[in-house]
Amino acid sequence: MKKRILSLLLALMMVVLLLPVTALAAETGIDTSALDMEYYGRYRDKGYSISVYNCGEYISDGADGGLDVNKAFEEVTGIRVIYSNYDTNESMYAKLKTGGAVYDIVVPSDYMISRMIAEGMLQKPDMSNIPNLKNIDEKYLYQSYDPTNEYSVPYTWGVLGLIYNTKMVEDEAVVASWGALWSEAYMDNILMINNSKDAFGITFAYLGLPINAESAEQVDKAVVLLKEQKKVIQAYVADEVFDKMIGGEAAMAPYYNGDAVTMIADNPDLAFSIPMEGSNLFTDCLCIPKESQKRELAEMYINFMLEPEVGLANTEAIGYSTPNTKVYELLDEETKSDPDEESLAHCGYYTYIGPELSLYIDSKWAEVLTADEKYSAMIMPMFLGACVAGIIALNIVRATRKKREE
């Protein structure tokens, strides 16, 4: 009898001990047994929060029955996530540069990272507080945008291409070239990407020029073509591209491969092409802005994003390729080979071209958009903000140079 009672007590103790982990796993949908709960539980019940500023549609939010990554982080760590979106690298940069808000995590692309490093806008995380950094394939580390790998942790990689409707564009040869975006055969059925970096990069590639501007003269050549394009396009788009392409409202649009995967899943008539002239290959990274006062919390968030289960959820939800070796091992062969090496052979990275040329491109992009009154009201506030940010950046660079000379 005593042995039976003792056995029941031991069994009850085991249930009680396992209950918190089991309950937490049920709430978050994540296998907490694979997590270092001592590491993630350091700030539980402190009432802390972090502010994350990410591009739209760029995280698994549980909308399609997958893992809600931010909710899982909150429940595992006790740290509240204040999450907001931006539409382009440039709008994110302008908001941070003008002091519009303070964020603890941002997710810029490679060329923007190098710009933000040069202008002192990022702080160095303590990489020893991000043990999952070991999961990142070394070929994505120590790249030209962050050669010492002190400021950024790779999140995704991808490529810019053309998403098109096969019912409207029946000949694949049409979208084998960026020239499709100037085709009068698709008048009012062409969407153009609404950011200066990609718009000029596409045009440079079509002209057979380097995708990174090397002179004002190169920019001017692209401006001529971009102004000519206005007569055939339906609209300039950012996240609006999803509704328009999924809804069959346009024949084609330049956009990113991961987002193309999402759109194709909702409309099987859509397909994706990487034009033969080449395109932009990019890496987006998790970074900590200089103004953040919550570095250790941000490091924990970054580490959580590198957990295999979290990384897999993000990859499946957003469709972008992963630099995380542990996640890559879990993917099927079709996903691993998309995009294929042959298509990427002529692609390259954007680089930071300096404050003077960057400001010149921004001004010329505004000139392209405002050449049509239809877009003037929309773009002028954005342009003025970009100009203010650009002038501030230029003055900082000049002041730094002067100080060095002294």
Region roles according to the model:
Residues N135, V219-E228, D266-K290:
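Periplasmic-binding protein-like
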Residues N280, D284, P289-C347, C387, ...:
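Mature extracytoplasmic/periplasmic domains
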Residues L18-I30, R398-R401:
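Sec-dependent signal peptide cleavage junction
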Residues A345-E406:
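Conserved C-terminal helix/tail region of periplasmic/extracytoplasmic solute-binding proteins
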Residues L10-L18:
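Hydrophobic core
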Residues M112-R115, M252-D269:
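A ligand-binding cleft/hinge motif common to bilobed small-molecule-binding domains
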Residues S51-G66, D87, A101-E249:
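Extracytoplasmic ligand-binding site segments that recognize negatively charged/polar headgroups
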Residues A25-R115:
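Early extracytoplasmic/lumenal segment of secretory-pathway proteins
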